[in-house]
Amino acid sequence: IPAFKLHASGYLMKPVSAKDVQVEIDNIKGIRQNQKPLTVKCFGTFEVYAKGEKLTFKRSKTKELFAFLVDRNGAGVTVAEIGVALWENDEDQKNQNYIHQLFRDLRQSLEAVGVEEIFERNNYFYSINPEKLDCDYYEHLKTGKPEFHGEYMSQYSWAEETCGLLWKKRT
């Protein structure tokens, strides 16, 4: 049946009964409940969605910090590494203090949508838990699906390294 090629969540054939409709609705509800609470789009420009709504951050650097942690795919990074990435090789102490403000803002933004457990701290290392995100980049790494079309977090210069690796892998 051609409709299955559309990757539909369900399909009803005539004659349709109320029971058939209810089965399909329950199936869709089950799919939605199994979805991860945060959706992250890395290909193109970086965006974050919570329950279908774009997540807003108090500061643009907070969003960039979250993008950097997503790019690291669960690997822990230090405040110094974050400072070098976000301020392009400027290890100014003032920036390191500002990073702690960004961490607070990130925690508050995640708490506001009930997903604060995504952000993790282990001694001096900060990371996110990739298992709690629905992320196009992570999906691409797992499955190799051709979702990458040349742009990766295009608003951040530090993401060019990952973009280059994705291009290399593509060819």
Annotate the PLM regions.
Residues 16-22, 26-171:
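Intrinsically disordered, low-complexity protein-interaction/activation regions
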